[in-house]
C-alpha cells in the first residue's frame, strides 16, 4: 500500500509543479479530442436531424445499421485508418500516419456514429412537432433543421459533450494511428497504458487523475443541463 500512497503523492507534485511532460500530454489529448468532436458534430448534427425528421423507405434499416456502428471497437477504426494512411494505402501520399492529424481523423470517424445516432434519436422523438410548426410558418427543409438546432440546443450540446467523453477516453485507435510517440502523439490514455507496463505509477496516477477530473467535469455539465 505504501507505493500506492507514494504514487499519489508524486502524482500531485507533478500536477502542482506544472511538469512540462505531463501538461504536454494533457493539452494534446484535449486538442485532438476537441477537434475530432467538433468535426464529427458539425457533420452529424445536421445529418442526424435531417434523417430523424425525414421519411424514407429504408429508415428502419438505417436505424439498425447506425446503432450498430455506435458500438464499433476503437481498434477496428484505428486499423482501418492506419491501412488507409499507410505508405501503400490510398492516402499514403499524404504522409499523415503517426501524426496528430491521423489521430483526429481516427477519433472523428470513431465518434461520428455516436453523435449521429444520438442526434437522430433526439430529432426523431422531438423534432416532428418542431418541424410541423416550422412548416406551418412556411419554413423550408434547411430552415426547419436550423429551427430544431435552436430549439434543442441544450440536448444537442449534451450529445456533443457525451461524444467528447467517448473521444478522450479511447485508447485503441490513437495508439494504432499515432504510435504513442513522446512529445508528438502521446496522449493521456496511451501514456497511462505505457506507464503502467513500465511501472511508472506516479506519472500514470497523475494522468489518471486528470482524466478522472475531465470525466467528472463532463458529468457535471451534463447533469446541470439536464436539471435546467
UniProtKB/Swiss-Prot annotation:
The keyword Cell membrane applies. The chain crosses the membrane at residues 25-45, 65-85, 102-122, 144-164, 203-223. PROSITE patterns: ABC_TM1. One of its GO terms (biological process) is transmembrane transport. Residues 26-222 form the ABC transmembrane type-1 domain. Pfam families: BPD_transp_1. Part of an ABC transporter complex involved in tungstate uptake. Probably responsible for the translocation of the substrate across the membrane. The complex is composed of two ATP-binding proteins (TupC), two transmembrane proteins (TupB) and a solute-binding protein (TupA). This is Tungstate uptake system permease protein TupB. The lineage of its organism: Bacteria, Bacillati, Bacillota, Clostridia, Peptostreptococcales.
